[in-house]
Amino acid sequence: MTIMRKTHPLMKLVNHAFIDLPTPSNISGWWNFGSLLGLCLMIQIASGLFLAMHYTPDTLTAFSSVTHICRDVNYGWLIRYIHANGASLFFICLYLHIGRGIYYGSYFYVETWNIGIILLFLTMATAFMGYVLPWGQMSFWGATVITNLLSAIPYIGTDLVEWIWGGFSVDKATLNRFFAFHFILPFIIAAVAMVHLLFLHETGSNNPLGIPSDCDKIPFHPYYTIKDFLGIVLLLTFFFTLVLFFPDLLGDPDNYSPANPLNTPPHIKPEWYFLFAYAILRSIPNKLGGVIALVMSILILALLPHIQTAKQRSLMFRPISQLLFWLLVSDVLVLTWIGGQPVEPPFIIIGQIASILYFAIILILMPIAGIIENKMLKW
């Protein structure tokens, strides 16, 4: 008698993806973040669905409806904080997942990597539109500033911005369409994530050594299901500590004031997970140049497979590249800090140096380090 999971059309799909999947025997905890991102997406879709039942996308009542959720709906405050902090958790896992991909050379699975970049853009768009929905001060002004960047596009810029706004400023039409897009995009993200997995399972997982592991594979279940489960328990422990004890730690106090088009906040800034890109945008005095740098700060990831000069895939045995990788991580943290500071000395020059360093490490220093390391292999 054949096992049902190997014959049933639906079970067979699950079996090939999560049960009998041949997996390298030496992948570390850094490979847990894929499953954790899946968990984050499920948390966001579930909590978002319940919030959408009580939220009204109208400029007059949006702020009040969020207040109503927190005060009058059973456990509404909990659902709201799970959703708000779930976005932060999503981006923490996302950045760690990308960092692992860069460190261990996973970007050589080009299709999987490029779909991952598309997923990053979709997630950033979803998070941005979600931040607008509570219609607080930072929601309104964040939406105004970020959508206004599109006006830097030559010739069609102004028309494009007014088309997105649905008028001559951020108003009811903007809020309404942002809610519609914010609702549908997570489902698109889930579908694209399936394609991401499909391409990954075509090649199999990478491993810390960056070498083919066909000779030493083990089944995904039970070895990695139990490992993923441990990751999930640790993640949820951290997450609920954040939600229940420090729910406003990562938020902006300005968003507790209703949106007022006549009163500009002293310092407009996005959520913490966009601050590194925001700092790069602000460090260039030209508007169009800033927008190009902003987009390139993410798109540059797509160049990684094409600019590697080292003969080894992983950074595990490449000390110079390791040093540059951790310099890049530090640089992104500096950019995140600068993005949250006002535009005044010495923050301006620090931001400009950090922005130049960000692109220089990836485009210039990493390839040079690869060439030096190739020569070191011959000694």
Curated annotation (Swiss-Prot):
<dbReference type="InterPro" id="IPR036150">
    <property type="entry name" value="Cyt_b/b6_C_sf"/>
</dbReference>
<keyword id="KW-0472">Membrane</keyword>
<dbReference type="Pfam" id="PF00032">
    <property type="entry name" value="Cytochrom_B_C"/>
</dbReference>
<feature type="binding site">
    <location>
        <position position="201"/>
    </location>
    <ligand>
        <name>a ubiquinone</name>
    </ligand>
</feature>
<dbReference type="GO" id="GO:0005743">
    <property type="term" value="C:mitochondrial inner membrane"/>
</dbReference>
<keyword id="KW-0496">Mitochondrion</keyword>
<feature type="binding site" description="axial binding residue">
    <location>
        <position position="83"/>
    </location>
    <ligand>
        <name>heme b b562</name>
    </ligand>
</feature>
<dbReference type="GO" id="GO:0008121">
    <property type="term" value="F:ubiquinol-cytochrome-c reductase activity"/>
</dbReference>
<comment type="similarity">
    <text>Belongs to the cytochrome b family.</text>
</comment>
<feature type="transmembrane region" description="Helical">
    <location>
        <begin position="226"/>
        <end position="246"/>
    </location>
</feature>
<dbReference type="Pfam" id="PF00033">
    <property type="entry name" value="Cytochrome_B"/>
</dbReference>
<dbReference type="InterPro" id="IPR016174">
    <property type="entry name" value="Di-haem_cyt_TM"/>
</dbReference>
<dbReference type="GO" id="GO:0045275">
    <property type="term" value="C:respiratory chain complex III"/>
</dbReference>
<feature type="transmembrane region" description="Helical">
    <location>
        <begin position="178"/>
        <end position="198"/>
    </location>
</feature>
<dbReference type="GO" id="GO:0046872">
    <property type="term" value="F:metal ion binding"/>
</dbReference>
<keyword id="KW-0999">Mitochondrion inner membrane</keyword>
<comment type="function">
    <text>Component of the ubiquinol-cytochrome c reductase complex (complex III or cytochrome b-c1 complex) that is part of the mitochondrial respiratory chain. The b-c1 complex mediates electron transfer from ubiquinol to cytochrome c. Contributes to the generation of a proton gradient across the mitochondrial membrane that is then used for ATP synthesis.</text>
</comment>
<keyword id="KW-0479">Metal-binding</keyword>
<feature type="binding site" description="axial binding residue">
    <location>
        <position position="97"/>
    </location>
    <ligand>
        <name>heme b b566</name>
    </ligand>
</feature>
<feature type="transmembrane region" description="Helical">
    <location>
        <begin position="347"/>
        <end position="367"/>
    </location>
</feature>
<feature type="transmembrane region" description="Helical">
    <location>
        <begin position="320"/>
        <end position="340"/>
    </location>
</feature>
<keyword id="KW-0679">Respiratory chain</keyword>
<feature type="transmembrane region" description="Helical">
    <location>
        <begin position="288"/>
        <end position="308"/>
    </location>
</feature>
<comment type="subunit">
    <text>The cytochrome bc1 complex contains 11 subunits: 3 respiratory subunits (MT-CYB, CYC1 and UQCRFS1), 2 core proteins (UQCRC1 and UQCRC2) and 6 low-molecular weight proteins (UQCRH/QCR6, UQCRB/QCR7, UQCRQ/QCR8, UQCR10/QCR9, UQCR11/QCR10 and a cleavage product of UQCRFS1). This cytochrome bc1 complex then forms a dimer.</text>
</comment>
<keyword id="KW-0812">Transmembrane</keyword>
<keyword id="KW-0830">Ubiquinone</keyword>
<feature type="binding site" description="axial binding residue">
    <location>
        <position position="182"/>
    </location>
    <ligand>
        <name>heme b b562</name>
    </ligand>
</feature>
<dbReference type="InterPro" id="IPR005798">
    <property type="entry name" value="Cyt_b/b6_C"/>
</dbReference>
<dbReference type="InterPro" id="IPR048259">
    <property type="entry name" value="Cytochrome_b_N_euk/bac"/>
</dbReference>
<feature type="transmembrane region" description="Helical">
    <location>
        <begin position="33"/>
        <end position="53"/>
    </location>
</feature>
<feature type="binding site" description="axial binding residue">
    <location>
        <position position="196"/>
    </location>
    <ligand>
        <name>heme b b566</name>
    </ligand>
</feature>
<keyword id="KW-0349">Heme</keyword>
<keyword id="KW-0813">Transport</keyword>
<keyword id="KW-1133">Transmembrane helix</keyword>
<dbReference type="InterPro" id="IPR005797">
    <property type="entry name" value="Cyt_b/b6_N"/>
</dbReference>
<feature type="transmembrane region" description="Helical">
    <location>
        <begin position="113"/>
        <end position="133"/>
    </location>
</feature>
<dbReference type="GO" id="GO:0006122">
    <property type="term" value="P:mitochondrial electron transport, ubiquinol to cytochrome c"/>
</dbReference>
<dbReference type="InterPro" id="IPR027387">
    <property type="entry name" value="Cytb/b6-like_sf"/>
</dbReference>
<keyword id="KW-0408">Iron</keyword>
<dbReference type="InterPro" id="IPR048260">
    <property type="entry name" value="Cytochrome_b_C_euk/bac"/>
</dbReference>
<feature type="transmembrane region" description="Helical">
    <location>
        <begin position="77"/>
        <end position="98"/>
    </location>
</feature>
<dbReference type="InterPro" id="IPR030689">
    <property type="entry name" value="Cytochrome_b"/>
</dbReference>
